[in-house]
Amino acid sequence: MANKPLTGFSVYSFILNLAAYGTIPMVSLYMKKGLCAPDNVIVLISSVALGGMLTGSFFSGGLIQRYGVKLILLAVHITYALANIALFLLGKGCMPDTWLYITIGAVLFAYSFMYACSDIASTCEMMLLATPGNKMVAMSFYNGFNHCGRGMSRMLTSLILGSGALAAHWTLGGIEFSHYQTLFLTYAICVCFAASLLVVVPAIFPEGDYHYDALHTGK
């Protein structure tokens, strides 16, 4: 494709979604199978995730206008990594169950909030990179990579769980972890790897003929 900045950004979005999109459904599975949480709590936590996305969608426009796409994307990576590390550490018995569920809910709300912000910020970046008169093709191209990353994230998670490749339980420093927690740690590592691809995002490192206004720089 002739539009190299858009191609690079689309590949970055694919990798980021591949690393990050499995976390939210994995939380529900972890709570049911790993923490043996009551059904009503699991449904409530899933509602909290939806609330985070709705809240993020509502506030993301103002946040992007104030801070710019660059800072929002950096905040997304930091939040994704810290949230997955927190979920990795939040095991059975680390605190009373009620507080454990509240903490997981808060982490998931923050994660979902930033996921919505990431979607809006990425769309802004994609529309800026699209050449005039070719925005529909650019949108299709970008969305193809975007949704492919999301689908493959859940597919790979399913294959890993189904294959039994991960130890069901393991210990570190006297603390026991499950294979669900191992996946959260894996997600965190993959998000950090995806951060290395920020070098191809023009909002982070502008180059060529793409000049960023206040919406993208936050200035």
Which residue stretches match the model-derived regions?
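Pair of pore-lining "gating" transmembrane helices in MFS-fold secondary transporters
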Residues: 2-27, 109
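Short amphipathic helix-loop junctions that connect adjacent transmembrane helices
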Residues: 25-42, 162
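Helix-to-loop junctions at the C-terminal end of transmembrane segments
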Residues: 56-69, 161
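Cytoplasmic membrane-interface "Motif A"-like loop-to-helix N-cap segments
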Residues: 65-80
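C-terminal ends and interior cores of transmembrane alpha-helices
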Residues: 78-98
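Hydrophobic core of transmembrane alpha-helices in multi-pass small-molecule transporters
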Residues: 97-118
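Intracellular juxtamembrane helix-capping segments at the cytosolic ends
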Residues: 117-131
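Transmembrane alpha-helix termini and helix-breaking/packing motifs in multi-pass membrane transporters
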Residues: 152-176
